[in-house]
Amino acid sequence: MGAGDKTAAGMPRIGMGTAVQGPKADPIRRAVLRAIQIGYRHFDTAAHYETEAPIGEAAAEAVRSGAVASRDELFITSKLWCSDAHRDRVVPALRQTLRNLQMEYVDLYLVHWPVSMKPGRFKAPFTAEDFVPFDMRAVWEAMEECHRLGLAKAIGVANFSCKKLETLLSFATIPPTVNQVEVNPVWQQRKLREFCRGKGIQLCAYSPLGAKGTHWGSDAVMDAGVLQEIAASRGKSVAQVCLRWVYEQGDCLIVKSFDEARMRENLDVDGWELTEEERRRIAEIPQRKINLGKRYVSEHGPYKSLEELWDGEI
């Protein structure tokens, strides 16, 4: 397993995430450039992360320096933010993303959440008045237009339940290529993975280590006793055990570290595999979702409960 290992659709199995608190352009640019030099080829961003511009600068610098022969060697994912999840705002939003990236296309464009907000609502905290009903069909038709225009080589979604995917597939003329969701040993997504596999949708795991250090993250993954025991017995880090487990499920994974040693470690999970006994022990870890998406729930909004947001799949 390495940064160059790809899915059947050509998506590198390991991507570098860039969702950081209070993003600062220069450290991100330097980290992305170093990641390219180390071997990463997939970079995950979003309009909401405000990291598109430094990724674009790093990509251009990598081409100039010869670290990659051309932009085509990189796989760039970005996402449509909720305030642009309206039929007439999707294509303009992607065009702005491309200006930020200084690129002619993204490899993958995702609907960030199955949520719509009033235009201009970008930063939390959000109020009940910010939310409007999510017109899935209208938004997806505009996503399909992004693909037809050549602005996005592939389109997909993030944070969609089985039920929402079923609805989307009932009318999509271009089905989603990817569903990017939280996946880790504490939230294993067995039902969703099986559903996606049956529909030809690639599952992509964010927060495979539990997103410790983020506003919603948890120590639950890295502190799990089972994972610590397996790591100690195999001479691996807990992170390597987690990433290997996600990889063995057939998922793509997004890892985030700007520390070079960790960047290298996150790529280096090849040449070994978990035993059947280790897989069984991981399968028995009590399950709980970490990223609940509480900020998108309001008693006066379209989603009045977490049950409604996730269609009971929590």
UniProtKB/Swiss-Prot annotation:
Span list, region Disordered: 1-22
Enzyme class: oxidoreductase
Tissue expr: Mostly expressed in root tissues, observed in mesocotyl and embryonic roots, seedling roots, crown and seedling leafes, mature bracts, anthers, pistil, caryopsis and embryos.
InterPro entries according to UniProt: AKR (IPR020471), AKR4A/B (IPR044497), Aldo/ket_reductase_CS (IPR018170), NADP_OxRdtase_dom (IPR023210), NADP_OxRdtase_dom_sf (IPR036812)
Function: Catalyzes the reduction of a 3''-keto intermediate during the biosynthesis of 2'-deoxymugineic acid (DMA) from L-Met. Involved in the formation of phytosiderophores (MAs) belonging to the mugineic acid family and required to acquire iron.
Residues reported to bind NADP(+): 44, 158-159, 180, 258-266, 273-281
PROSITE patterns: ALDOKETO_REDUCTASE_1 (PS00798), ALDOKETO_REDUCTASE_3 (PS00063)
Entry EC no(s): 1.1.1.285
One GO term describing the cellular component: cytosol
Record keywords, A-Z: Iron, NADP, Oxidoreductase
Protein name: Deoxymugineic acid synthase 1-B
Entry's family note: Belongs to the aldo/keto reductase family.
Pathway of action: Siderophore biosynthesis
UniProt keyword DNA-binding present: no
Chemical reaction(s) catalysed: 2'-deoxymugineate + NAD(+) = 3''-deamino-3''-oxonicotianamine + NADH + H(+); 2'-deoxymugineate + NADP(+) = 3''-deamino-3''-oxonicotianamine + NADPH + H(+)
UniProt-annotated catalytic positions: 49
CDD domains on file: AKR_AKR4A_4B (cd19124)
Species name: Triticum aestivum
PANTHER family per record: ALDO/KETO REDUCTASE
GO biological process: response to iron ion starvation; siderophore biosynthetic process
Molecular function GO labels: 3''-deamino-3''-oxonicotianamine reductase activity; aldose reductase (NADPH) activity
Superkingdom in the source lineage: Eukaryota
Site (Lowers pKa of active site Tyr): 79
